[in-house]
A protein has these predicted regions:
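Short, surface-exposed patches at the edges or C-terminal ends of soluble domains, predominantly
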Residues: 1-167
Protein backbone atom coordinates (compact mmCIF):
# COMPACT_ATOMS: atom_id res chain seq x y z
CA UNK A 1 0.00 0.00 0.00
CA UNK A 2 1.25 3.49 -0.83
CA UNK A 3 -0.03 6.98 -1.39
CA UNK A 4 0.19 9.35 -4.33
CA UNK A 5 0.20 12.73 -2.64
CA UNK A 6 -0.55 16.32 -3.51
CA UNK A 7 2.11 18.75 -2.35
CA UNK A 8 2.29 22.06 -0.59
CA UNK A 9 3.99 23.90 -3.45
CA UNK A 10 2.92 25.88 -6.51
CA UNK A 11 2.47 22.72 -8.64
CA UNK A 12 0.44 20.63 -6.12
CA UNK A 13 0.28 17.49 -8.30
CA UNK A 14 2.95 14.79 -8.36
CA UNK A 15 5.55 14.75 -11.13
CA UNK A 16 6.93 11.64 -12.79
CA UNK A 17 9.56 11.34 -10.04
CA UNK A 18 6.98 11.09 -7.25
CA UNK A 19 4.73 8.76 -9.25
CA UNK A 20 7.69 6.47 -9.96
CA UNK A 21 8.71 6.53 -6.28
CA UNK A 22 5.16 5.49 -5.31
CA UNK A 23 5.21 2.57 -7.78
CA UNK A 24 8.67 1.50 -6.59
CA UNK A 25 7.35 1.40 -3.02
CA UNK A 26 4.85 -1.24 -4.20
CA UNK A 27 7.25 -3.54 -6.02
CA UNK A 28 10.67 -3.35 -4.39
CA UNK A 29 12.54 -2.73 -1.18
CA UNK A 30 13.48 0.93 -1.09
CA UNK A 31 16.91 2.25 -0.08
CA UNK A 32 17.02 3.06 3.62
CA UNK A 33 18.71 6.19 4.96
CA UNK A 34 19.74 5.99 8.61
CA UNK A 35 20.23 9.12 10.70
CA UNK A 36 22.56 8.81 13.68
CA UNK A 37 21.00 9.74 17.05
CA UNK A 38 22.23 9.95 20.62
CA UNK A 39 24.94 12.62 20.32
CA UNK A 40 22.87 15.78 19.93
CA UNK A 41 22.64 15.43 16.15
CA UNK A 42 20.04 17.31 14.15
CA UNK A 43 16.69 15.62 14.70
CA UNK A 44 14.69 13.98 11.90
CA UNK A 45 11.44 14.20 13.85
CA UNK A 46 11.54 17.81 15.05
CA UNK A 47 10.28 20.68 12.92
CA UNK A 48 12.64 23.63 12.98
CA UNK A 49 15.33 25.53 11.15
CA UNK A 50 18.09 23.31 12.51
CA UNK A 51 16.31 19.97 12.27
CA UNK A 52 15.57 17.63 9.37
CA UNK A 53 11.87 16.75 9.58
CA UNK A 54 11.04 18.60 6.36
CA UNK A 55 13.91 16.92 4.52
CA UNK A 56 13.06 13.42 5.77
CA UNK A 57 9.42 12.79 6.71
CA UNK A 58 7.35 15.81 5.64
CA UNK A 59 4.61 14.37 3.42
CA UNK A 60 3.46 17.72 1.90
CA UNK A 61 7.09 18.58 0.93
CA UNK A 62 7.71 17.17 -2.55
CA UNK A 63 11.47 16.79 -2.06
CA UNK A 64 11.41 14.93 1.26
CA UNK A 65 13.24 11.60 1.25
CA UNK A 66 9.94 9.83 1.91
CA UNK A 67 8.38 11.28 -1.26
CA UNK A 68 11.48 10.62 -3.36
CA UNK A 69 11.55 6.87 -2.77
CA UNK A 70 13.60 6.40 0.40
CA UNK A 71 12.77 4.97 3.79
CA UNK A 72 14.20 6.78 6.81
CA UNK A 73 15.23 5.30 10.15
CA UNK A 74 16.93 6.62 13.26
CA UNK A 75 20.09 4.70 14.16
CA UNK A 76 21.70 4.46 17.58
CA UNK A 77 25.27 3.17 17.77
CA UNK A 78 24.72 1.34 21.08
CA UNK A 79 24.11 -1.74 18.93
CA UNK A 80 25.44 -2.71 15.48
CA UNK A 81 24.03 -0.74 12.56
CA UNK A 82 21.33 -2.80 10.81
CA UNK A 83 22.41 -4.39 7.54
CA UNK A 84 19.47 -2.82 5.68
CA UNK A 85 20.81 0.73 6.19
CA UNK A 86 22.13 1.82 2.77
CA UNK A 87 23.55 5.16 3.89
CA UNK A 88 24.18 6.57 7.36
CA UNK A 89 23.88 10.32 7.88
CA UNK A 90 25.88 11.85 10.72
CA UNK A 91 24.52 15.37 11.08
CA UNK A 92 26.60 17.52 13.39
CA UNK A 93 27.37 15.49 16.51
CA UNK A 94 27.53 17.49 19.74
CA UNK A 95 29.23 14.85 21.86
CA UNK A 96 31.88 12.23 21.18
CA UNK A 97 31.33 8.57 20.40
CA UNK A 98 31.90 6.01 23.12
CA UNK A 99 34.42 3.24 22.28
CA UNK A 100 31.66 0.64 21.69
CA UNK A 101 29.77 3.08 19.47
CA UNK A 102 32.93 3.79 17.50
CA UNK A 103 33.42 0.03 17.05
CA UNK A 104 29.87 -0.34 15.67
CA UNK A 105 30.47 2.54 13.24
CA UNK A 106 33.82 1.05 12.15
CA UNK A 107 32.14 -2.31 11.48
CA UNK A 108 29.52 -0.58 9.30
CA UNK A 109 32.24 1.18 7.31
CA UNK A 110 34.32 -2.03 7.01
CA UNK A 111 31.42 -3.88 5.41
CA UNK A 112 31.14 -1.15 2.76
CA UNK A 113 28.55 1.08 4.41
CA UNK A 114 28.03 4.55 2.96
CA UNK A 115 28.34 7.72 5.05
CA UNK A 116 27.17 11.28 4.64
CA UNK A 117 28.77 13.53 7.24
CA UNK A 118 27.38 17.03 7.80
CA UNK A 119 28.86 19.57 10.16
CA UNK A 120 29.69 23.16 10.92
CA UNK A 121 33.19 24.31 11.92
CA UNK A 122 32.11 25.06 15.50
CA UNK A 123 31.55 21.31 16.00
CA UNK A 124 35.24 20.54 15.27
CA UNK A 125 35.84 19.17 18.73
CA UNK A 126 33.52 16.21 18.14
CA UNK A 127 33.63 15.86 14.37
CA UNK A 128 37.38 16.12 13.62
CA UNK A 129 38.29 12.78 15.27
CA UNK A 130 35.69 11.07 13.08
CA UNK A 131 36.68 12.96 9.92
CA UNK A 132 40.42 12.41 10.47
CA UNK A 133 40.03 8.74 9.54
CA UNK A 134 39.07 9.88 6.05
CA UNK A 135 41.79 12.52 5.74
CA UNK A 136 39.33 15.38 6.23
CA UNK A 137 39.19 18.17 8.79
CA UNK A 138 36.94 21.14 9.41
CA UNK A 139 38.47 24.55 8.73
CA UNK A 140 37.06 28.05 9.14
CA UNK A 141 35.54 29.64 6.06
CA UNK A 142 32.66 29.40 3.63
CA UNK A 143 32.49 26.54 1.16
CA UNK A 144 28.91 27.03 -0.01
CA UNK A 145 27.60 30.38 -1.14
CA UNK A 146 24.38 31.40 -2.87
CA UNK A 147 25.00 33.42 -6.00
CA UNK A 148 22.61 36.11 -7.26
CA UNK A 149 23.09 35.09 -10.91
CA UNK A 150 21.58 31.64 -10.35
CA UNK A 151 17.77 31.66 -10.67
CA UNK A 152 15.92 30.31 -7.65
CA UNK A 153 13.80 27.23 -8.05
CA UNK A 154 10.35 27.90 -6.61
CA UNK A 155 10.49 24.89 -4.30
CA UNK A 156 14.18 24.28 -3.67
CA UNK A 157 17.38 26.26 -3.99
CA UNK A 158 20.71 24.54 -4.66
CA UNK A 159 23.84 26.44 -3.62
CA UNK A 160 27.05 26.19 -5.64
CA UNK A 161 30.44 25.24 -4.24
CA UNK A 162 33.10 27.94 -4.41
CA UNK A 163 36.80 28.14 -3.74
CA UNK A 164 37.88 30.01 -0.65
CA UNK A 165 39.21 32.83 -2.86
CA UNK A 166 35.63 33.54 -3.99
CA UNK A 167 36.11 32.62 -7.66
Amino acid sequence: KTFLRVYNDMYHHPFETEITAAFKRLVMELPKVGFLTGHGERDVKKIGDRDYNTFTWDKPFRNSLLNQGFDVEEVNLNSPIPKDINILVIAEMRSELLPTQKTNLDQYIARGGNLMILSEPKRKEYMDPLLAEFGVKLVPGINVKLLARIPLWPELNSPLLERESGR
